[in-house]
Amino acid sequence: MANNIYRVPTIYSDIKKTTEPLSVRVPGSKSITNRSLLLAMLAEGKSTLRGVLFSDDSRHFLKCVQDLGFETTVDEESCIVTVEGLGGKLPCEETTLNVGSAGTAARFLTATLGVSEGVFHMDSSEQMKRRPMDPLLSSLAELGCEVRCEGEDGHFPFTLTAHGSGQDHISIDIGHSSQFLSALLIASTLSSEDFTIQVEGTHGMAYIEMTQKMMEQFGVCVERPTPDQFRIPAGQHYKALDYQIEPDVSAACYFYAMVPLLGIPVCVEHVHFESLQGDVEFLRILEKMGCTAQDTEKGVLLLPPSALSDAGTQTPAFHGITVDMSSCSDQAITLAAIAPFADSPTCITGIGHIRFQESDRIHAICTELTRMGIRCEETQDSITIYPGTPKPCTVATYDDHRMAMGFALTGLRTEGIVIDDPGCCRKTFENYFEVLDQVIAEISEV
């Protein structure tokens, strides 16, 4: 990387001829790391978290836990953090927190503090100030929390004056983010009554299931009387754990996407289909496009399509697909980045909510593909991408880590792709481009 750009090496014609799969190790899951930090904070006693991801998002979350007064120890080299929980109590009743650009910190901590007791001044990065908070803040106001927004209503920064939970039920619209529901679920144990959450919207349920399973691992049972209702019986408390965090499947997917793109087998260590993470569904999508998956002791091994296209023996034939990616929407960019090389159009649906993430991802994808000369079409909640050969292009990343990491894949197969501001990947995968360079050196003869 130089001058804050990354020139992607085009290695497609230089792939080593080998039957040995590429073996990759990725850092811990951001989603699980940040959930486990909050659950450990709310538990009674000392939790030891292993395999912790250290990135911009998780560091902001950890700093917030520390700024609230919780005792922690941090060993970045060993990826271990300990948190001394106080059984739902907070060490301080007034403080200022900055969540950075971390959506999980923004939503999860806001919900927990909003049903606690105290005065909490909440700030964020400029990027996070553009992302919606209103559904969660409105729900907290219904529960008795005083919310004072200091800028645009429903956005950071704001001050919470919390008096505990004033009622035993709430409704939440998750049309913009499933994190609103996850946040309220985790915080619900602070209520002295049975707590019921009525949900409007259906997207992101894979993340909700992750939250529910992790709550159960930490000792709290969540009931689901109907598909759109959650009930948390009173009297439950989180227990401190020695907890192993899974590798980040979202990060693993960039390397699995190389399988159809470059025609190489890939195994990401310790990634298995029984993962808590919804992005494991992306591997099933790649199977439908022609790949074959084997869940081995080491991790899922993904094999490239065996058939070859009419374009020549170099090109693995993988198929376009129409797919609802609402359960693994973080991989919409990944699929879009390799879709031009498929043998038929790809239509990604169920992703309207990604317009409200680090960037308007639907618009960003279509803008950058169009600049590469690739035909694509967008609706409010879908993208259709047609086969073609991408032209040289400097890809704008919109301060969005997934745009940077995803579109680097495109350049592995076509000349002239440059990633602008690759450092934005520090949000979730600080050394992504270093790992990518190592992979390139291993699989190519350049």
In which residue ranges do the predicted regions lie?
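Short, structured segments at the rim of ligand-binding sites
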Residues: 1-446
